[in-house]
Amino acid sequence: MFSTANTGRRWPAFLMACLALLVGFASASQAGLEVVGLDVGQGDCTLIISPTGTTMLVDAGYTGEGVGTVLPYLQSRGIKALDYTVASHYHVDHIGGLDEVINALTRDSLKVAALDRGWSYTTQAYTQYTTAVGTKRQTITEGQVVDLGGGATVRCVAVNSHGHLAAPYDNGRYDENNLCVVLLLDYGDFEMVLGGDLPGYNTSSYHDIESLVAADIGDVDIYKVHHHGSSNGSNTTFLNTILPEVSLIYVGTGNSYGHPTQTLINRLVAVNSYIYQTELGAGGTIPSGKGEVVNGNIVIDVVPGSYTINGDVYDCGTAGVPPTGGPLFLSVYPNPFSGEATMRFNIAESGPLAIRIFDVEGRLVNVFQTVRGNTYTWDGTSLDRREVPAGVYFVRISGPSQSLSDKLVKR
């Protein structure tokens, strides 16, 4: 991965101009993916716009931020309705503005679904949210994939503690942060993970859910930092598994929580993840050359092979044949594929593995049991040996206690 920001080496102006032209040509020939981390202060809000124009709004900050920040931005972009909303969990700094946005847009402001973790919660913000979304409310499930079009998908990696805590999950039985929806946004070689306020340490209120889901996420380009940079999230096991090239911290200046903490910032720096922060916050300081405070929105534009963040250029993922090192990895090549796809993987446990292929609806397409070694080639057929149609598929490789997942695109 190359970054004009992360390595401390900035491209000469001439090369940057040439790159801008190339990116412009790519955008003109194929619309890309756009992700905007809106600055809603000490809250969360992420807008995803697929290459086909499908929109997904993940959280909308505190009450007041919906009409004060999110709605004006949507209107400035000519967005009169949303296809999807996602509530990562029911804390007011995440859902407080969702009802405001939905109520203020057009009559059919929500086209498809309002996705959340289900169950119930007893706060005014929750009641206002559920009233606004009405019959469009749907409970998201683990493994569910939302096809946003143009090759962009969002997969639910975890919800309601990833099975760690026992149901029921309502009325404040557990701290909401333990129950967060974790999403993996995928577009070609680009991957970004968003997990609300998911905790990574065991305390009197929190449970380490991060370590349970890390392998299912795998290496990503961008990590939306959990819990505004609290030291109770982003543990070292999680970070060393997802290895984010870039980390985004959504935080408010002068917050009373001391976010982001210096401990959290140091963890991100230790895995060489360049930091973009919406506001100054009230805690730790990003070391020189390791990140920047944007004081505004964080805008990510993704085209095949690369992405930019507020003008800084990065390469997406790892192309071609994957490396063979590392305790946990899964890569597929070629990807997209037209005939066969070879999966190269390593799970740090002995014994046979099972490989399962799913379609975007979560239906089992094929399964291969008692696979040994670290390479397997799928010929693109289903259980009944028929060739599967072109589209997006997911592979899951499972051992007795570990599993890895990745996306395949068949042409």
Language model feature labels by segment:
Residues F14-G24:
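Bacterial N-terminal signal peptides
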Residues Q369, N374-T377, R386-R411:
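C-terminal tail/sorting-segment detector
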Residues P51-M56, T63-D116, L212-H228, L243-S247:
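Active-site metal-binding motif and surrounding structural segment of the metallo-beta-lactamase
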Residues H259-G320:
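C-terminal regulatory/interaction regions
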Residues F2-M16:
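Bacterial N-terminal signal peptides that target proteins for export
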Residues P322-N346, F358-R363, A390, K407-R411:
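Surface-exposed, proline-anchored Ser/Thr-rich loop/turn motifs
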Residues Q42-D44, T63-E65, Y90-G96, S120-Q124, ...:
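Active-site environment of divalent metal-dependent phosphoester hydrolases
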Residues S29-K80, T139-I222, E292-T318:
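Core dinuclear metal-dependent hydrolase active-site scaffold
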